[in-house]
């Protein structure tokens, strides 16, 4: 993986983590949606694309009614949503995850039991940790086991293309980064 791809991994992980974590109408995401509609993701997406991933990129970057997307978000990820966002629901030990973060002096969070925090942690590690072992441990212990189950749920339950596309592209970037970590 080139240096550009690695840097883009951090950016994309942070973006995707926030898209899974925040309501689409959250003001924090306003600039992210503008950037997506300007095809910013296509400009930083360094992975090879096939027809399916091109369609997914387009689905994330098309102008969308944020209120409609907010309804989909509620249906999928709200407290009684169809997709469990809690990493503990996928067999991840939250206390072990919190300790992993503490050992690496990562910022404290109110609740670590959310899938999006795994993507945000991956981004933080990419930007702030020189430890290949830490990244490998994080992927093997926390991110990949949870992501496989969570993303499948999103793909199966989403009715709008946006979240199905987000799940597919998340899977692609994680697979590429996992392969890179395995090679090193």
UniProtKB/Swiss-Prot annotation:
Domain of life: Bacteria
Entry GO terms, CC: cytoplasm
Cited SUPFAM superfamilies: TorD-like
InterPro entries: DmsD-type (IPR026269), TorD-like_sf (IPR036411), TorD/DmsD_chaperones (IPR050289)
Signal sequence region: none
One annotated GO biological process: protein maturation
Family: Belongs to the TorD/DmsD family.
Protein's UniProt name: Uncharacterized protein HI_1543
Protein's organism: Haemophilus influenzae (strain ATCC 51907 / DSM 11121 / KW20 / Rd)
